[in-house]
Amino acid sequence: YTVCGYVTDEVTGETLIGAGVTVSELAEVTGVTVASTGSATEEIHSVTAKTGTSTNNFGFYSLTLPEGEVELTYSYIGCASKTKRISMKKDLTLNVALAPSAEIRSARITARKDAGIRSTYMGAIEVPNELIANTPVVLGEKDVLKTLQMMPGVQGGNEGFSGIYVRGGGADENLMLLDGTSLYNVSHLFGLLSVFTPEAVKKVTVYKGSFPARYGGRVSSVVDVRTNDGNSKKISGSVTAGFLAEKFHLEGPLKNENTTFSLSARGMHTFLFDRVIKWAGSPLNYAFYDVNAKVSHKFSDRSRGWIGFYSGRDYFRYEDKSKSSKRFYGSDYEPYTMITGNENNLNLSWGNNVLSARWTYIFNNKLFADFTAYGNLYRMGIHSVTENLEKSELGETSFRSVSDYSSGILDAGLKADFDYTPSTNHLIKFGGEYVRHGYRPEITKSRIKDVNDSRVFADTTYSDAASRQVNGNEMSLYVEDDITGERQ
């Protein structure tokens, strides 16, 4: 028979990813104890054999057990364990909520030296949000990728920047996923921060090697970021002002506990930097923002749905103006004044916009399904203006040049993932994905104007192919078979 269900946080109602479910099969053994009075009493002792599993990315677990009495122990980091004793006489659905525990007790940690190499995911590291929140970083801004830099096999490159280099690979050779959707150029402030807002993150898993087949493979690593579903018990939130940015987070139930929302926003404040920039006379200006929004709904014990949105963008501006005047003498030795003005403006921006819809369904106690539709638009653009002016009593000469550069990637995809658990030590994952890629590699337009004769030269630089979108189709199927043998 099979027992399945969800493991959640008792306070917030959030599903817990990677929660442990340990099974103790009870076998009754009769023994005889001789009391100090000399009389013999019969006692029943329980001899247990432990096995177990853990919850998936949606907090779901499934265990197939033989008929009889069993004890299920549910545990999660930072939560008090809970034990349920059940009788396996039919298939059961058992949802459990764990309460956070602030009590610190003495503990003995025992581990096997070969535990890592015996795992099918020996290159995987799970990073909970609590670790991200407690990691000291430069300028006080908590960051997901800077926390990963402290993990074995991961390096950070330049000190203080958020790029990760896994086992000798490059910073651009990592697959970055936000709730299953690929992101591009995941950096703010030219690499000082990542686009992942810590308040919106539930859990991060990084695969440094032996990538699971469902990700399709990458050169260096896979970073899978999962966001919060929202507090189903009450409205809660926070407002934070840091050295670089302000952050806002709000979550709670919309109508009842079955529908929740989570909203996080982060933006770089410029009031401090504007004063420093103006005081230093610098022509630079910079800003960025992130917005994460998610609505979750529980249709039934077997069916749940999510709609998620992310938008993040960086803006860089350079503006330089200069003006000078000089006195000259003409051929007739008459003096005249030449006024020269120069203006240079440069605007650079880039960012991702993601929209996704997800539905999960439990077909039976052994088969869990996840269906996702998503789209991501990444855009990068440069707008520059150069203007020169020369004016005197002899006449006026003006030159103006405007240049626009843009490129982008549009991904639209459908994905289906299934988890099938035929037995406690056997998990089969299978599914497929279709992605439609739209590439705009490079479009450059230039306009040059000479004021003297009012001529305008329009130049669409590069070939005609640059103005067209190049499309590509990607389809994949995968099967993962994870079997854990009994340790002798």
Predicted segments with their positions:
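A short, amphipathic beta-strand motif
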Residues: V3-D9, G59, V96, A107
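Periplasmic-side early beta-strands and strand-to-turn transitions of outer-membrane beta-barrels
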Residues: S232-K233, K255-W350, M380, S384
